[in-house]
């Protein structure tokens, strides 16, 4: 990991994670408790609690490390050379052709073995 990503754990990290867990439980229980209310209000309540929980989680050492990992992953994704549409289509057609050939070979082998067993048995 990156040296910047390795943040020292605070003594309040456990308290923050417990608070995150409590917020998630409150969201789940609140959604069930207020099931008679319109769905819009329940979704808004869950979103508010989720944003608060995410903010608290990102304040911990593990949360900061996760955020740093996500930023580095985004940078790496931008470096990937993605195949063109033509390359993707050609590769897909090759895979389909190989699957069909293998299916025919296995079907033929199964038929041959079935015929041999039926000749031996009866």
UniProtKB/Swiss-Prot annotation:
Listed PROSITE patterns: SECE_SEC61G
GO biological process terms on file: intracellular protein transmembrane transport; protein secretion; protein targeting; protein transport by the Sec complex
Signal peptide positions are none
Query: What is the recorded membrane topology of this protein?
Result: Multi-pass membrane protein
Q: Where in the cell is it found?
A: Cell inner membrane
The GO molecular function terms of this record are: protein transmembrane transporter activity
The source's domain of life comes to: Bacteria
Which cystines does this chain contain?
none
Q: Which parts pass through the membrane?
A: 14-34, 38-58, 93-113
* One family name in Pfam for this protein: SecE
Q: Which GO terms describe its cellular component?
A: plasma membrane
Q: Which UniProt keywords apply?
A: Cell inner membrane, Cell membrane, Membrane, Protein transport, Translocation, Transmembrane, Transmembrane helix, Transport
Family matches, as HAMAP family: SecE
Q: What does this protein do?
A: Essential subunit of the Sec protein translocation channel SecYEG. Clamps together the 2 halves of SecY. May contact the channel plug during translocation.
Which protein family is named in the record? Belongs to the SecE/SEC61-gamma family.
**What do we know about how this protein assembles, alone or with others?**
Component of the Sec protein translocase complex. Heterotrimer consisting of SecY, SecE and SecG subunits. The heterotrimers can form oligomers, although 1 heterotrimer is thought to be able to translocate proteins. Interacts with the ribosome. Interacts with SecDF, and other proteins may be involved. Interacts with SecA.
What is the designated name of this protein?
Answer: Protein translocase subunit SecE
């Amino acid at each position: 990991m990156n040296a910047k990503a390795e943040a020292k754990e605070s003594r309040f990290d456990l308290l923050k994670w417990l608070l995150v867990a409590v917020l998630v439980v409150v969201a789940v229980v609140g959604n069930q408790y207020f099931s008679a209310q319109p769905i819009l209000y329940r979704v808004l309540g869950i979103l508010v609690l989720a944003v608060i929980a995410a903010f608290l989680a990102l304040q911990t050492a593990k949360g900061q490390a996760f955020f740093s990992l996500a930023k580095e992953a985004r940078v790496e994704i931008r470096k990937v050379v993605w195949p063109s549409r033509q390359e993707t289509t050609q590769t897909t057609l090759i895979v389909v052709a190989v699957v069909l050939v293998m299916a025919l070979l296995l079907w033929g082998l199964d038929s041959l073995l079935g015929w041999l067993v039926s000749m031996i048995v009866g």
